Amino acid sequence: MSLQLLRNTRIFVSTVKTGHNKTNTQEILVQDDISWGQDSNSTDITVNEAGPRPTRGSKRFNDSLNAAEWSFSTYILPYKDKNTSKQIVPDYMLWHALSSGRAINLEGTTGAHNNATNFMVNFKDNSYHELAMLHIYILTDKTWSYIDSCQINQAEVNVDIEDIGRVTWSGNGNQLIPLDEQPFDPDQIGIDDETYMTIQGSYIKNKLTILKIKDMDTNKSYDIPITGGTFTINNNITYLTPNVMSRVTIPIGSFTGAFELTGSLTAYLNDKSLGSMELYKDLIKTLKVVNRFEIALVLGGEYDDERPAAILVAKQAHVNIPTIETDDVLGTSVEFKAIPSDLDAGDEGYLGFSSKYTRTTINNLIVNGDGATDAVTAITVKSAGNVTTLNRSATLQMSVEVTPSSARNKEVTWAITAGDAATINATGLLRADASKTGAVTVEATAKDGSGVKGTKVITVTAGG
């Protein structure tokens, strides 16, 4: 007799049921919190009658199997693929199945995709009743089992600052099936020794995590060191099971519900400038029904030199009123939910992973959704002929010089932020008032989401 030991478990995911190879099947490096199983439903029939000696027996019938359940954790391990020279993670199939209903296309721009700078995940193509299906193969010692037609229900990044960056995955499948034969050679499909040694330098230290949180209405950025947090992506999957008399039924399929990208943050309550107390006061003071914050968690920190990091971005989040946590050191807890620009936009947020992020590429990722796409870092406002004075009723064309010149989106919005002697339109044409004089401050704000601004003062004179 032999027993199966959990420590000898290996997990594989595949997009196919036959013809397994390294392009359609992937080994997942999991921790010891792995679990899987499938329970059932039954009906008890009892009788209830009067009299001194009633019938008290009962019968039980098996009705159906619930959807098979599974969950496990993986470390976040971005590395450079030796074959493509692009950034990748060992569990990229999971990220794709979480985010898209199409076949995997790492060369694309939605779901899971990559380039030489970073591996990215967005949710712009997740409006499907059925997301990309995976089949999970479980090898424990020499015993194989298989969970058929799985959808990933949830992925949660738990930012425990004493831990290593990891993701907890969970979901369901139609049925858990023991296999009599080996479906493929695990040593041929599994992660090779060279790749395993490569990713040893990719572990991410949560202790270095940075929170970037900015009020999008006031452009006010807060500086809050966190003590913990979560970042959760949920597809709200439900399974459909028939109900046939005299037969045990199994689930026949699954469907997505509302997509949710939510999170929570904890921090000590401090009174420093732009700290957690100031955020608390600002939210209490305004009491907005709807607010808008850009939230980014930078796991692994940001540096001028290249370091492994994971960036979790809620591009437009609604932040709940924080709660006060009473402990030896007073703290605060903040809950948030990412909101799309339109209900069908799929732009709630995105994630980026790289073994070589820098301060610049992290900013690019937060602004553009891709660390390889340059964001605006500075704006110089200019005027035609470089003039600084303008006669009443005259016009002056304003323009900008954007840094870096390689920035993808160089468009700006124009505004007058001080003075009333002139107005400016959407194209940057400044028009002096016919009767007023004085200085006006012309401001240009980058449209790429970076929030970068530039200003120039023009003085309106009576002329001569």
Curated annotation (Swiss-Prot):
It comes from the Viruses. Residues 40-59 are annotated as: Disordered. GO terms for biological process: symbiont genome ejection through host cell envelope, long flexible tail mechanism; viral release from host cell by cytolysis. One of its GO terms (cellular component) is virus tail. SUPFAM superfamilies: Invasin/intimin cell-adhesion fragments. It is found in: Virion. Keywords: Late protein, Viral genome ejection through host cell envelope, Viral long flexible tail ejection system, Viral penetration into host cytoplasm, Viral tail protein, Viral tail tube protein, Virion, Virus entry into host cell. Residues 375-453 form the BIG2 domain. Homotrimer. The tail tube is made of 40 stacked trimeric rings. Interacts with baseplate tube protein p140. Polymerizes to form the tail tube of the phage. Tail tube protein polymerization takes place around the tape measure protein (TMP-pb2) and is probably directed by chaperone proteins. The tail tube is involved in viral genome delivery during ejection. The C-terminus possesses an Ig-like fold of the Big-2 family. This is Tail tube protein pb6.
